[in-house]
From Swiss-Prot:
Amino-acid positions noted as binding substrate in the UniProt annotation, renumbered to this chain: 330-336
SUPFAM superfamilies: P-loop containing nucleoside triphosphate hydrolases
Compartments (UniProt record): Cytoplasm
Organism: Caenorhabditis elegans
Name of the gene encoding the protein in the UniProt record: adss-1
Molecular function GO terms recorded: adenylosuccinate synthase activity; GTP binding; magnesium ion binding
Involved pathway(s): Purine metabolism; AMP biosynthesis via de novo pathway; AMP from IMP: step 1/2
Name of this chain's protein: Adenylosuccinate synthetase
Length: 457
């Protein structure tokens, strides 16, 4: 029996490099991932816009979700509302990818291009590609979404956007889903697949009404337009080529980490992986390609729809956050529920995603609050928890432990250096940073692109 040799880390790495024919540490980390770290609506669009303009981003890519998510970007003297389009579409130097992990509603795609004035720009079609492997959202999916939500008791409703996102992902897993590639291939075969899909759902929900011929005629027009503009392609291969050429890729996560299908407040979650793993599977890059992971965090907490929200406020402070913060959903138009920032959940979010930096947004909304609280721990039945409950019913019995801060009662809008923020404001930021052990690099103090403090590059 051979002897066991103890190797140092350097010796082990050298050994593996020889066996693997390369370096473990020199991988081409040209992919950055930007994720919502809470329940969505954190202000991702603004940070994405800043990164594109200031960090030479060559490609932006959507990796999951559909037109159920919403980004708002204020730039070029106007406000843009994005649901399925990557935010880089407003930059003439940026290429945009809708990845295989996205579920694509083509009606919404073309409407969004028109709504945001993209169709009026010369050459826009040369800067965007839809993955041929992405699944299509049909009107029947939206109807099923509504029927499923209606069938739930009031206390069990998920708060879906009724955009058909969940049923489309269900079709994908059930393996009767229809992909963009199917639409672009033999149309008769596509039509037959579509008819079978409709029949499948009508057996479950007989009240569904679908004019199959009208729908197919519409998709034939979509097919012709996609082909004419050459908007569909192999996005995995394209991104691989861009990475090999040293181009910088920014992946835009939709929704938020606390809505992840696995790690969120299940079942009150979205239907895809909105954590960092979804970025890899949603555009087809290996984990070794990812360098920076930026978590976007609102300086307080919001949520749309139903589901656990331990720090939710039902008093004048909650109303004040909603009013000053203009907390209305971009996609649904529903008022967002508001509360104090939950650092216990945020630390869990950081644990799962490995954030290398945090972007703290809407700090200015707290400028006039005399007292500000942050959640730092949970108790359940008198027991201190080390992690959030995995069982849905347990959330209702959570006791929240808070740390209280005295407000700074000074305006922060217009501040561009961290040291120029009020001292009490800096203390608030530093406490968050120390608690989750991730540097806060970007701080939003207003809606405009320029209303941003950058602490380090």
């Amino acid at each position: 029996m051979g002897s066991v040799t103890s190797k140092t880390n350097d010796e082990l790495e050298s050994f593996l490099n020889k066996r693997l024919g390369g370096s473990m540490t020199s991988s081409n980390k040209t992919v950055s991932v930007l994720l919502g770290a809470q329940w969505g609506d954190e202000g991702k669009g603004k940070i994405i816009d800043y990164l594109i303009e200031n960090h030479k981003i060559n490609v932006t890519a959507r990796c999951q979700g559909g037109n159920n998510a919403g980004h708002t970007v204020v730039a070029n003297g106007r406000k843009y509302d994005f649901h399925i389009l990557p935010s880089g579409i407003i930059s003439p130097t940026c290429f945009n990818v809708i990845g295989n992990g996205v579920v694509v509603n083509l009606d919404a795609f073309f409407s969004e291009l028109a709504h945001n004035g993209i169709l009026e720009e010369s050459g826009w079609e040369k800067r965007i590609m839809i993955s041929s492997e992405a699944h299509l959202v049909f009107g029947v999916h939206s109807q099923v979404d509504g029927r499923q939500e209606d069938s739930l008791a009031a206390k069990n409703k998920i708060g879906t956007t009724n955009r058909g996102i969940g049923p489309t992902y269900s079709s994908k897993c059930f393996r009767n889903g229809i992909r963009v590639a199917d639409l672009m291939a033999d149309f008769e075969e596509f039509s037959e697949k579509y008819r079978r899909l409709v029949e499948h759902y009508k057996k479950q929900f007989p009240s569904i009404e679908v004019n199959v011929d009208e729908e197919l005629a519409k998709f034939k027009q979509h097919r012709e337009k996609l082909a004419e503009l050459k908007l569909v392609g192999d996005t995995v291969g394209f991104i691989h080529e861009q990475r090999n050429a040293g181009k910088q890729v920014l992946v835009e996560g939709a929704n938020g980490a606390l809505l992840d299908i696995d790690f969120g407040t299940y079942p009150y979650v979205t239907s895809s992986n909105s954590t960092v793993g979804g970025a890899c599977t949603g555009i087809g890059v290996p984990p070794t390609a990812v360098g920076n992971v930026i978590g976007v965090v609102k300086a307080y907490q919001t949520r749309v729809g139903t589901g656990p929200f331990p720090t939710e406020l039902f008093d004048s402070d909650g109303e004040k956050l909603q009013t000053i913060g203009k907390e209305v959903g971009v996609t649904t138009g529903r008022k967002r529920r508001c509360g104090w920032i939950d650092l216990f959940l945020l630390r869990r979010s950081a644990m799962i995603n490995g954030y290398t930096a945090i972007a703290l947004t809407k700090l200015d909304i707290l400028d006039t609050f005399p007292t500000i609280k942050v959640a730092v721990g949970y108790k359940l039945n008198g027991q201190v928890l080390s992690s959030p409950p995995a069982q849905a019913n347990a959330w209702g019995a959570i006791e929240v432990e808070y740390k209280e801060f005295e407000g700074w009662n000074e305006p922060t809008v217009g501040v561009r250096k961290f040291e120029d923020l009020p001292e009490k404001c800096r203390q608030y930021v530093k406490f968050i940073e120390d608690f989750i052990k991730v540097p806060i690099v970007y701080i939003g103090v207003g809606a405009e692109r320029e209303s941003l403090i950058v602490r380090q590059q």
